[in-house]
Amino acid sequence: MSERRTTAQSPDRSSAGSVRRLLAMAGIGGAFAAALIGPGTAAAQAESCPDVEVVFARGTAEPAGPGRVGQAFISDLQNSLNGQSVGVYAVNYPASYDFLQSAPQGAGDASAHVQSVAASCPDTSIVLGGYSQGAAVVDLITADPAATFGFGQPMPPAVADHVAAVAVFGNPSDKIGRPLSAISPLYGAKTVDLCNGADPVCSNGDDRAAHSLYVQTGLTDQAADFVAARISAAPESAPMVDASDTVG
């Protein structure tokens, strides 16, 4: 079940120690199915698919939903997309301080949802995002398996064609020199991985306040511009993902 799933029409744009310690800081194939359900139902499904689907994982201890950073990023992105419809899925997970239990739960939920959207809405551009622990959730489903700290359900490679961009903020893996843009062979080139100044969660700095200032420093808007450009440059359609291969 989703924590939050909404679709909105965006307005026109008005202006252009140890890894454990570190982390604690922070079945029918799609084509065959379409043939069975018939063109009328398939068309109805296509009409219900948003142009863009944002899948966002909130930070530790934030209330259910995309979180403060996630909501700001989504709003900035809607303003950048010139009228394209935007669906929002808030990753359903505890976001608790028990990181090694919480983050893998989020990764499993996010992976299942992304695969479902890729199979049922192949023309939808998927955007992955996360803040703080939520950024680590995104790391788990997109990174090289060797970097996933025991999580064993990375998304199938074919799903990458459906993901237009990835935006993460305050990512704990940055602190150990492994930003998502560097550790993900399939998603690295389409990723913006932002650390706010001396944020100690993602850098060797000690400015704790910086971890709470991603909206105020304009980094959500910067990420939205990057993602909007990636969506504009994406091909019109991606290969069909076989629904029998999805998780969920």
Model-predicted segments: where are they?
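Active-site catalytic motif of lipid deacylating hydrolases and related acyltransferases
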Residues: 47-125, 197-246
